[in-house]
């Protein structure tokens, strides 16, 4: 898939390719490349973020899926005199290489437009190399229930925490 978002102050693009049955093994293989540029002269900064990654997903046990991957990101932040003190502290170029893994328990009746069931997932990103080391944890949950013939109820929750390691602050 290819996604582009453009507005007056930013340009974002992502190219994502997924092979849902890599080498006929039942594992999915995903590659992505992304770039984002934000030019905010009123707030005193401009930044460019470029990244890419590769991951694989597979059904480890019945309804339990595992995901493993690596991602790399480069963030170049330039500030001017009008930037906040917080942004000025973050000014510079930062690189990271992270190992990502996750698990999902999928009890939906079908993956596309489910009418019953739930999916619960946990994902974590750990630094292999990072100018500012961090750990990112994400917990997501979605629940689906048929309320009537034409109405499906859905409840969703998404929580993410990013914590700096050692004396490093989170950017």
What is the role of each PLM region?
Residues 1-121, 145, 151:
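Gram-negative/organellar outer-membrane beta-barrel architecture
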Residues 17, 141, 157:
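Hydrophobic, well-ordered secondary-structure elements that form the walls
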Residues 37-39, 126-130:
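A generic structural motif
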Residues 47-49, 134-138:
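Amphipathic hydrophobic-ligand
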Residues 111-113, 130, 165:
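Short helix/loop capping segments that flank catalytic or ligand/cofactor-binding pockets
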Residues 124-126, 159:
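Short, structured patches in soluble enzyme cores that scaffold and shape functional sites
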Residues 138-145:
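Short secondary-structure subsegments characteristic of cysteine-rich extracellular domains
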Residues 150-171:
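Extracytoplasmic gating/loop element in the C-terminal half of outer-membrane beta-barrel translocons
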């Amino acid at each position: 898939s290819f996604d582009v978002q453009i507005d007056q102050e930013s340009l974002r693009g992502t190219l994502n390719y997924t092979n849902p049955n890599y080498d006929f093994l039942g594992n999915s293989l995903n590659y992505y490349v992304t770039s984002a540029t934000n030019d905010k002269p009123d707030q005193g900064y401009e930044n460019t973020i470029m990244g890419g990654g590769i991951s694989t997903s597979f059904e480890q046990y019945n309804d339990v899926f595992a995901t493993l991957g690596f991602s790399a990101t480069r963030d170049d932040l330039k500030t001017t005199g009008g930037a906040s003190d917080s942004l000025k502290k973050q000014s510079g170029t930062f690189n990271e290489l992270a190992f990502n893994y996750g698990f999902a328990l999928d009890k939906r009746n079908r993956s596309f437009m489910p009418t019953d069931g739930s999916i619960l997932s946990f994902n974590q990103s750990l630094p292999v190399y990072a100018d500012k080391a961090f750990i990112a944890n994400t917990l997501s949950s979605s629940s689906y229930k048929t309320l009537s013939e034409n109405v499906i109820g859905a409840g969703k929750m998404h929580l993410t925490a990013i914590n700096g390691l050692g004396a490093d602050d989170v950017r």
